[in-house]
Amino acid sequence: SRARYYVSFSYLRQEGMWNSKWTEYNDKFSTQHVLNRYNLRSNLDIDVNKYLNVSLDLGGRIDNISQPRTGVFSLVTFGAVEADPMAPVYTPNGELYSKSTAQNPARLLGSSGQDKNRRRNLYSTVNVTGDLSELVKGLKANVTVSFDAFDVFQSTQDNSVNSYEYDYMNMNVKDPSQFEYKQTTKYSALTNPSANERANYYNFNFNAGFSYNRSFGKHAVDARAFIRIRIWKTYATLTTMM
């Protein structure tokens, strides 16, 4: 056959382990860890004629990651491992309980905002091979061009929820309505996104030359002559090697 091809697409979704009761505490946004990954890979190989072959390799990946701004260490350490086992989740009047010395994991998740990251990878290679045996037996010409790119774009948003503390160890209180509350944190809506380009680079490679492979009786000759150009750019830093 003169043309051969291969195409592959895959999708992966992963979600975190946090209780959805608290990650979905706010309307219209979630503080759960979520990864959506898209992969594409394709190969195309064409025999243009008996002297010329062209191939293309193309691949790409996109990761969309959403996570709470409160880190896993804080959620696990202060929300679980070092949490006060006597501290309540709610106050008697139904509000979230929290105190500077007793972090409530429910409040930590509900007021952690959002940290979103988009990662993109692109891989591409074009290879052209010409058979010059009609001119010189065993001689071939080859050109290879590749381009790879990678970037990470981040957006962050903050929010807060209402939470209160009270002296739940006060033995003089006979009825829950007698407790006095002090507001610990105050509600604030999700802020506008704050953008940050965390990484951005590309890599360009060019390789061109000739190869010679021929046998003469008991002897063989295998030789190559080529030129290579590489350009690597990260933001404004440019490196060229030849």
Question: Residue locations for each model-derived region?
Answer:
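Outer-membrane beta-barrel transmembrane domain signature of Gram-negative proteins
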Residues: S1, A83-K99, N159, S163-M242
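Extracellular loop and loop/strand-boundary signature of outer-membrane beta-barrel proteins
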Residues: E24-S30, N43, L109-D115, N127, ...
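Flexible loop and strand-edge segments within Gram-negative outer membrane beta-barrel domains
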Residues: R2-S10, Q14-M17, T31-Q103, G113-N121, ...
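Residues on the lipid-exposed face of transmembrane beta-strands in outer-membrane beta-barrel proteins
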Residues: S1, S42-I46, S124-G130, A208-Y212, ...
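Outer-membrane beta-barrel translocator domains and adjoining extracellular loop/strand segments
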Residues: W18-E24, Q67-F73, Q154-S160, T234-M241
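Charge-patterned, long linear interaction tracts outside catalytic cores
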Residues: T125-S146, N159
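Membrane-embedded beta-strand positions of outer-membrane beta-barrel proteins
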Residues: V7, L56, V126, A141-V143, ...
